[in-house]
Amino acid sequence: MDKIEVRGARTHNLKNINLVIPRDKLIVVTGLSGSGKSSLAFDTLYAEGQRRYVESLSAYARQFLSLMEKPDVDHIEGLSPAISIEQKSTSHNPRSTVGTITEIHDYLRLLYARVGEPRCPDHDVPLAAQTVSQMVDNVLSQPEGKRLMLLAPIIKERKGEHTKTLENLASQGYIRARIDGEVCDLSDPPKLELQKKHTIEVVVDRFKVRDDLTQRLAESFETALELSGGTAVVADMDDPKAEELLFSANFACPICGYSMRELEPRLFSFNNPAGACPTCDGLGVQQYFDPDRVIQNPELSLAGGAIRGWDRRNFYYFQMLKSLADHYKFDVEAPWGSLSANVHKVVLYGSGKENIEFKYMNDRGDTSIRRHPFEGVLHNMERRYKETESSAVREELAKFISNRPCASCEGTRLRREARHVYVENTPLPAISDMSIGHAMEFFNNLKLAGQRAKIAEKILKEIGDRLKFLVNVGLNYLTLSRSAETLSGGEAQRIRLASQIGAGLVGVMYVLDEPSIGLHQRDNERLLGTLIHLRDLGNTVIVVEHDEDAIRAADHVIDIGPGAGVHGGEVVAEGPLEAIMAVPESLTGQYMSGKRKIEVPKKRVPANPEKVLKLTGARGNNLKDVTLTLPVGLFTCITGVSGSGKSTLINDTLFPIAQRQLNGATIAEPAPYRDIQGLEHFDKVIDIDQSPIGRTPRSNPATYTGVFTPVRELFAGVPESRARGYTPGRFSFNVRGGRCEACQGDGVIKVEMHFLPDIYVPCDQCKGKRYNRETLEIKYKGKTIHEVLDMTIEEAREFFDAVPALARKLQTLMDVGLTYIRLGQSATTLSGGEAQRVKLARELSKRGTGQTLYILDEPTTGLHFADIQQLLDVLHKLRDQGNTIVVIEHNLDVIKTADWIVDLGPEGGSGGGEILVSGTPETVAECEASHTARFLKPML
């Protein structure tokens, strides 16, 4: 088989298409946003490839795998097992880091456990073995008469029942052993659980400390060391919590006797109690109630709400503050900022041991007086946060929590012992904090000698390979300790791609979703090289992509179209690029051949030096004290290679500051900065991202854009409705009354199938129409509410032409190019690009003040050349109303049409974080140091 044959694919909007795809080639699927590319690549080819592979497993194994729906297709042959690498958001687990996802951290743990050199944390000297005499002297230096026992560790944290071990010890004449911390008789040992980890230490000797024990102790120690293979523990018999003495014939600090357990990989894992920092449990950060978040506005008084929930509206807590004010002689009506530092301290952190007289009045007006210390607002919040069982209280209090690096482990996540093991004078945390490019250099230059070199050889090869793949997909600026939560979709996808190349599989079908997202043109070539490498191993690589270079690099291009949604779903052209360019109906072909192109604007809007937004001293992540100047009322692009600090500057600094000052938000905490000027030119800030407009099937474009309410009002105003007394609520499928109760207005019923994917069957009461029969009897211009929800935006625009409020909102959806989606289409079925355009349409339909600051992060994700043209028209329209638009973007077609560009760099990670140049595209294109300039110049 050298081809994959698809016959009769009808998934989503595909129109019964037939295709022959060559195997072991690089195939690019392209077309307008919403034309059916993902339906073909993911929901048909990948879903069927995965399903067939999973069907071959046992029913028991299948229930643990999330199965995809069986695609609606007549026949596919020539498929291989499929692996998809999607844009889906990364892990939200705070324990995942770049190092753990790529498995590099696992190999580093192994390396440090096998060839690391432990040192004493206090004296920084390598640990050396202790002799029996040293051990005896140490024990005899304990207070005389202290009852101690000498233990030999036999089994450390291993699963099993260990019956044989316990029988052997008893037969050797030992009477007691300490099992999982409890001392018990070996004649009647407890039954151990097979699946739990156990620790068994045999009691070799029990004694009271006195001077004439030297000979006896020396013999006991020799026995213990022989039994355990070189370690012994001395424990206090009277106080099980007392610190135990650890002895090692292997290594210990000669100065203070600090010794550590044998090095094992789990000592270097922050996800294992053996290695995690005990203070922060291996998270690297500690949560605390932040006074700056609790006191949002120091100009308010305590009575007026300086501390939310403690003002005069909250009677109970306000009584406490009044009693406190009487005791410390301060005024609850005075602004918080004017009160003394001592008052601040007492209110926030409590009165310590000092008793204060509190007057409490209950609902009936009875007063009681009690004397007790005041716990402090922050301690009160901490206590309520720990004790509460209500998720609402927890969520409310979580708004006041900030994170700070853990003081014990300084944010490295590891316990003290693990931080003091070195390979060539470098501890593990130092390697985790290196960028991937830097780490690769370190391992290339690492020279180990003798036996250690032999042990480390294989481990180093694995680490080196993985680092190389990450560098090849353009991620050399990330550090291994970077938390997975902070990665962008494109970065996470490329990390998964790098792990796949590391796996080195052959004969697999890879399906990728726009791997070039968030990647600067400079890094694009390396990414394409990686995809070609995957193909050359003998895999079929199918990529959904709009990037010009990717389309040119493909062996076979499939153009889906001609339009989007109901107007798409057909194969417009397929074959090598030349064949695509020759088809006049193919939009992709026309843009690729240059017959159509996005024009450079004839004239740009000039900047007004009087009106600027100026952010000074931004220092978040890798930013180096940056000063950003944005002209007000212009369309500005923020550019720079991946990792240069664009998102930190705009999403983590500018947006939260503006959100706090313009929208009055309290949650967003901006990255460190010195000052901001010029926000008076704006009345609000809006971030338009690609996150879904709703996470449930009940959200849809009609509810999100506010079209649904006037539609329901129209239906409620029909004479028949008025006669029956129907209100607009009758026409909502979210509340009782008008909806079909059998499916609760969903239109489908979910049937759980345990070994198969859950299936959704149309509700047999309403036949999938979501409403009950009576509601569907009401018609407006001959259509029922269900038929209206089933219209495309284009049809609805025509249908409601006479209703100006609706026509205007629907027209904006048309303007952003969403002519084809249905009014009632579930939000979960919209692509990221579509969701973003629904949000844009909602903004356009508002009566604008022309003073809004819009922030967009890579709006061209998922957009075809023709879609980008539409997006630019919308953004230019918003700008022409006087609004300011700031876009983070790599797409050169967008960059060349901007009025102003701010370019960050020169490199990613620690090599970036500076503003190289800002000005018009023509100015920026002349900058020698800028990578963006190199690619932008030919476009102008």
From Swiss-Prot:
<keyword id="KW-0228">DNA excision</keyword>
<keyword id="KW-0547">Nucleotide-binding</keyword>
<dbReference type="GO" id="GO:0005524">
    <property type="term" value="F:ATP binding"/>
</dbReference>
<keyword id="KW-0227">DNA damage</keyword>
<comment type="subunit">
    <text>Forms a heterotetramer with UvrB during the search for lesions.</text>
</comment>
<keyword id="KW-0742">SOS response</keyword>
<dbReference type="GO" id="GO:0005737">
    <property type="term" value="C:cytoplasm"/>
</dbReference>
<keyword id="KW-0862">Zinc</keyword>
<dbReference type="GO" id="GO:0009432">
    <property type="term" value="P:SOS response"/>
</dbReference>
<feature type="binding site">
    <location>
        <begin position="31"/>
        <end position="38"/>
    </location>
    <ligand>
        <name>ATP</name>
    </ligand>
</feature>
<dbReference type="InterPro" id="IPR041102">
    <property type="entry name" value="UvrA_inter"/>
</dbReference>
<feature type="domain" description="ABC transporter 2">
    <location>
        <begin position="607"/>
        <end position="937"/>
    </location>
</feature>
<feature type="binding site">
    <location>
        <begin position="640"/>
        <end position="647"/>
    </location>
    <ligand>
        <name>ATP</name>
    </ligand>
</feature>
<keyword id="KW-0234">DNA repair</keyword>
<keyword id="KW-0677">Repeat</keyword>
<comment type="function">
    <text>Plays a role in recovery after DNA ADP-ribosylation.</text>
</comment>
<dbReference type="Pfam" id="PF00005">
    <property type="entry name" value="ABC_tran"/>
</dbReference>
<dbReference type="GO" id="GO:0016887">
    <property type="term" value="F:ATP hydrolysis activity"/>
</dbReference>
<dbReference type="Pfam" id="PF17760">
    <property type="entry name" value="UvrA_inter"/>
</dbReference>
<keyword id="KW-0067">ATP-binding</keyword>
<comment type="function">
    <text>The UvrABC repair system catalyzes the recognition and processing of DNA lesions. UvrA is an ATPase and a DNA-binding protein. A damage recognition complex composed of 2 UvrA and 2 UvrB subunits scans DNA for abnormalities. When the presence of a lesion has been verified by UvrB, the UvrA molecules dissociate.</text>
</comment>
<keyword id="KW-0963">Cytoplasm</keyword>
<feature type="domain" description="ABC transporter 1">
    <location>
        <begin position="310"/>
        <end position="587"/>
    </location>
</feature>
<keyword id="KW-0479">Metal-binding</keyword>
<keyword id="KW-0238">DNA-binding</keyword>
<keyword id="KW-0267">Excision nuclease</keyword>
<dbReference type="GO" id="GO:0009380">
    <property type="term" value="C:excinuclease repair complex"/>
</dbReference>
<dbReference type="InterPro" id="IPR027417">
    <property type="entry name" value="P-loop_NTPase"/>
</dbReference>
<dbReference type="Pfam" id="PF17755">
    <property type="entry name" value="UvrA_DNA-bind"/>
</dbReference>
<protein>
    <recommendedName>
        <fullName>UvrABC system protein A</fullName>
    </recommendedName>
</protein>
<dbReference type="InterPro" id="IPR003439">
    <property type="entry name" value="ABC_transporter-like_ATP-bd"/>
</dbReference>
<dbReference type="GO" id="GO:0009381">
    <property type="term" value="F:excinuclease ABC activity"/>
</dbReference>
<keyword id="KW-0863">Zinc-finger</keyword>
<dbReference type="InterPro" id="IPR013815">
    <property type="entry name" value="ATP_grasp_subdomain_1"/>
</dbReference>
<feature type="zinc finger region" description="C4-type">
    <location>
        <begin position="253"/>
        <end position="280"/>
    </location>
</feature>
<dbReference type="InterPro" id="IPR004602">
    <property type="entry name" value="UvrA"/>
</dbReference>
<dbReference type="GO" id="GO:0008270">
    <property type="term" value="F:zinc ion binding"/>
</dbReference>
<dbReference type="GO" id="GO:0003677">
    <property type="term" value="F:DNA binding"/>
</dbReference>
<dbReference type="InterPro" id="IPR017871">
    <property type="entry name" value="ABC_transporter-like_CS"/>
</dbReference>
<dbReference type="InterPro" id="IPR041552">
    <property type="entry name" value="UvrA_DNA-bd"/>
</dbReference>
<comment type="similarity">
    <text>Belongs to the ABC transporter superfamily. UvrA family.</text>
</comment>
<feature type="zinc finger region" description="C4-type">
    <location>
        <begin position="740"/>
        <end position="766"/>
    </location>
</feature>
